[in-house]
Design a protein with these regions (language model features):
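N-terminal glycine-rich phosphate-binding loop and ensuing alpha1 helix
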Residues: 1-38
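Active-site phosphate/pyrophosphate- and oxyanion-stabilizing loops and adjacent acidic/basic residues
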Residues: 16, 68, 175
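Residues at the starts of beta-strands that form the adenosine-phosphate
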Residues: 25-27, 51, 104, 183
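Short beta-strand segments
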Residues: 28-30, 82, 107-109, 152, ...
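Conserved beta-loop-beta/alpha segment of the NTase-like Rossmann-fold superfamily
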Residues: 38-125
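Catalytic-core segments of class I nucleotidyltransferases/pyrophosphorylases
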Residues: 78-79, 86, 92-99, 113-115, ...
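Structural signal for interior beta-strand "rungs" in well-ordered beta-sheet cores
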Residues: 223-224
Length: 224
């Protein structure tokens, strides 16, 4: 989260996106690696005109365990962001769909050319999530929509996540919603999205900013 994108730590861009939704009044950073370094950089969030709270996992808890550990005492809908995703999505629209559908969970899906490198997510005609297929083979591909690593969740569903053990949001928590026939809906987003988890993608982000494919404060369109 603190690798630089030009002159700013990557996490700045995610916080900028969250700040576009006025009702998001607190950012909780779930940390495990170098927590003090991250806290030194971002402080209490006042310099960014937001409120930041830090939660440090005692041991690695997995993607679902980390969400429960950070948000177990929350009572309102929670927006969850993977720490390596850069996007220009309209989060307010995602939250609006979540509320309109009275969903227990909403997942953002994004189309990619080759879902075999990720894991596809199947939905029905009503936009309900029906199945996850991790790193499918070519003959298993039924859609090119993948998990974009952005969710809106209801905290009272966290009770199914075990405490103090590593648990996966993709392999365990989400399938439990499907098994219980909870209202679990998808928001399809076809705009700019990238996972910067590889050196190649990290380099690509800089090119995208230079070429104007990704535009956000403090950047203007640098290709103009």
């Amino acid at each position: 989260p603190i690798v630089p994108i030009f002159n700013r730590p990557f996490l700045h861009y995610q916080i900028d996106l969250l700040k576009q939704v006025p009702e998001i009044d607190e950012v909780i950073l779930s940390l495990n690696y170098q927590p003090r370094r991250i806290e030194e950089i971002f402080g209490d969030g006042s310099a960014l005109n937001t409120k930041i709270r830090y939660v440090v996992e005692p041991v690695p808890l997995g993607t679902a365990g980390a969400v429960k550990y950070a948000g177990d005492k929350l009572t309102e809908s929670v927006v969850v962001f993977n720490g390596d995703v850069l996007t220009q999505i309209d989060l307010a629209a995602v939250i609006r769909l979540h509320r309109e559908r009275k969903a227990r969970a909403t997942i953002v899906l994004t189309p990619v050319q080759n879902p075999t490198a990720y894991g596809l997510v199947e939905t029905d005609a009503g936009g309900n999530v029906t199945r996850f297929v991790e790193k499918p083979s070519a003959d298993e591909i039924t859609t090119n929509n993948i998990n974009a690593g952005i969710y809106v969740l209801e905290p009272d569903t966290f009770d199914r996540i075990p405490s103090d053990v590593a648990w996966s949001i993709e392999r365990s928590y989400f399938p439990s919603l499907i098994e219980r026939r909870e209202t679990f809906v998808a928001y399809i987003y076809a705009g700019y999205w990238i996972d910067i988890g590889t050196p190649e993608k990290y380099t690509q982000v800089h090119r995208d900013i230079m070429d104007g494919r990704y535009v956000t404060a403090p950047f203007l369109n640098m290709s103009a």
